[in-house]
Amino acid sequence: MTTLEIWLLAISLAMDCFTVSITSGIIMRRICWRTFFIMAFFFGLFQAVMPLIGWFAASRFSHLIEDYDHWIAFGLLAFWGGRMIKESFSNEDKRCFDPTKLKVVVTLAIATSIDALAIGISFAFVGINSFTSILSPIVIIGFTSFVISTLGSLIGVFCGKRFNLRMELWGGLVLIIIGVKILIEHLFLS
């Protein structure tokens, strides 16, 4: 793979992180750099580590992973999306979806990085055959996801302040749509 192809791949993998970060920023409605960097760190970390795991396990476990990875991603995103929709109709004191909580961030990071696991498996079949040859792609993927997630959070805060239209409802729908997209891609388009 060329460097340009790796950057384009990194940008495309970061789009789910970007969307989830926008959703989180919308819910927060204020700039909280610490939270944004923690979220971006975990998104970048999981986007970088998953291809490494996929690449490493490609020859041994690919048949086990590919049968249900999309269901895991869908389930996690649908769960958090459903909670957000439910919470959009409840009192603010009773809301559980909190993008500042580590459990929420890690769950979303795992869900949005399942595709990166599949990319790692494909790396094993396109001539990336040593740790030194996969190091550059995973660093680029992780860095890109970090930067794009941070930008998404900022965009979300801006949108959340300008539009006060049950943003948790819309954010929950976005998470469910991402989950459905992943499911459709794996069930019908692969």
Curated annotation (Swiss-Prot):
InterPro entries with a match to the protein in the record: Mntp/YtaF, Put_MntP
Pfam families assigned: Mntp
Entry keyword Transmembrane helix: yes
Keyword Transmembrane among record annotations: yes
Compartments, as annotated in UniProt: Cell inner membrane
A GO MF label: manganese ion transmembrane transporter activity
Annotated keywords: Cell inner membrane, Cell membrane, Ion transport, Manganese, Membrane, Transmembrane, Transmembrane helix, Transport
A cellular component annotation (GO) from this entry: plasma membrane
Source organism, top-level taxon: Bacteria
Topological relation to the membrane, as annotated: Multi-pass membrane protein
Transmembrane segments: 6-26, 36-56, 61-81, 108-128, 138-158, 169-189
Similarity-based family: Belongs to the MntP (TC 9.B.29) family.
Function summary: Probably functions as a manganese efflux pump.
Protein name: Putative manganese efflux pump MntP
